[in-house]
Amino acid sequence: MDFEPWWLIFLPLLFALGWIAARVDFRQMLSETRSLPNSYFKGLNFLLNEEPDRAIDAFIEVAKLDPETSELHFALGSLFRRRGEMERAIRVHQSLLSRADLPQADRESAQHELAQDFLKAGMLDRAEQAFEQVLDTRFAVPAVRALIRIYESEHDWPRAIEAVKRLRALIDEPVPQLVHYQCERAVSAMAGKSPDLTAASEALDAADHAAAALRGQARGQASEARIAMLRAQLSRLDNKPERERAYLASVLTIAPEYASLIAGDLLECYRRVGQQAEGLEVLRAHYLRYPSLDMFNVVFRELRAQQGYKPAWAFAREALRAHPSLLGLDRLLEAELAAYEDQNPIVDAADGANRVAQANTAAADIASGADLSLLRSLIHKHTQRLDRYACRVCGFEARHFYWQCPGCNSWETYEPRRLEEMK
């Protein structure tokens, strides 16, 4: 193709137009920047330097100069909430909502921010109402999640379950706590003097259905263990001991780490039908495969009761040699002291020689009992903190096992093991 020389005329013209456009844009940007108050830049500087208190003061000055700036009000409200000044955060967002000229998108944002203010302030009723007003907006997912937390904190399990169903309609992902919501329904149905066994059974069926989505996961094992334990409780209330025993025994296979939570109840099932020796062997075999302090305690005490001192201590020595544990030794000494105190070595004797011999034996027993007591008290001081369960999310420690952490409200964050075993 031939090059046309007249194109050369347009090249300088194009460069000139580009230079003029750039100058106009630059001047406009400078003009807009100069129109911003100095307090605005001070606020940004304080934020960058992590000085929220001074940033708030600077932004308040800007807001006074330009009360129509919604973005600045959102920033102020967020800062107030982060600092825990909930009344001021609520006032900022309510003032935004009171503006008739506020665009719809900003109105939805202000409503969502206000709901978060109420939630953090602990005003759950008002938070619930505020979140419900944004369920049909782009904030639907976080709003439903917040409503779930509210219903959960109020132990309103039916409404929590309905909220989870709504969440599942918005996002396609499993919600593990749904299993526990159904389990809590079952617990409520079985509580009191007149338990509703039908309602409990229906709730556990629903829990089974929810747990199906979690099968093969670690959380799925925990959920199935809890369902089996509650079905055992339901069977006991329904006078079906064989079912109770079967459900408890199933925990040994579906979630072996949780076996210590049902060991005592399972042993009692065997004891009721005169098969305590068989029950002991079941638990002992499980301990050898999945050792834990709580299972050690159950097996040792039952072995001591059924077979006596020597077999129990032989088991204890072997167990503690394989898995050294101060807490295990503390439990062992506690059981021995209890057994010692149940015995009374001093009895009346007509024969003087027998009386002297018995007195000597009693004195030796008392000395050994005092030694046991001293040894146990020394060890117990060092094991008190280790004899706890701990949340792996927030670290909250408790003497009892919880499915939901009392500290951070997370589900299934308590390991069914004592602190000493986790360190």
Which ranges hold each PLM region?
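Long, contiguous interaction/recruitment modules in multidomain scaffold/adaptor proteins
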Residues: M1-R34, S153-P176, E412
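Generic helix N-cap/helix-start motif at coil->alpha-helix transitions
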Residues: F3-E4, T33-S39, D66-H73, P103-Q111, ...
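Residue at a conserved register position within TPR or TPR-like alpha-solenoid repeats
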Residues: F46, F80, F118, Y151, ...
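Structural motif corresponding to the intra-repeat A-B loop/turn of tetratricopeptide repeats
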Residues: N49, R83, A121, E154, ...
